[in-house]
Swiss-Prot record:
Calcium among keywords: no
Main function: Delta-conotoxins bind to site 6 of voltage-gated sodium channels (Nav) and inhibit the inactivation process.
Protein keywords: Cleavage on pair of basic residues, Disulfide bond, Ion channel impairing toxin, Knottin, Neurotoxin, Secreted, Signal, Toxin, Voltage-gated sodium channel impairing toxin
Entry keyword Zinc-finger: no
Cystine residue pairs: C53-C68, C60-C72, C67-C77
This protein's name: Delta-conotoxin-like Ai6.1
A GO term, aspect molecular function: toxin activity
Propeptide residues per the UniProt entry: 23-49
A Pfam family hit: Conotoxin
Family assignment from sequence similarity: Belongs to the conotoxin O1 superfamily.
Span of the signal peptide: 1-22
Length: 78
């Protein structure tokens, strides 16, 4: 009996926590799909195109390989 009560309280708590921490409970998936569709129609609106990268001759990071073109060799983009 105690275990059943604990389980019911836990489920109610987790359900309330899920709704309380949701970003936008009203039409959340609709807004997500709408934004994705807009980015497909207008590729320049995509966040992926706003990638920060280094041009040739600039200092770079060997771990991230953050050169726009070429490779990061001896901390300089080639």
């Amino acid at each position: 009996m105690k275990l059943t009560c604990v389980m019911i309280v836990a489920v109610l708590f987790l359900t309330a926590w899920t709704f309380a921490t949701a970003d936008d409970p009203r039409n959340g998936l609709g807004n997500l799909f709408s934004n994705a569709h807009h980015e497909m129609k207008n590729p320049e609106a995509s966040k992926l195109n706003k990638r920060w990268c280094k041009q040739s001759g600039e200092m770079c990071n060997l771990l991230d390989q953050n050169c726009c073109e070429g490779y990061c060799i001896v901390l300089v983009c080639t």
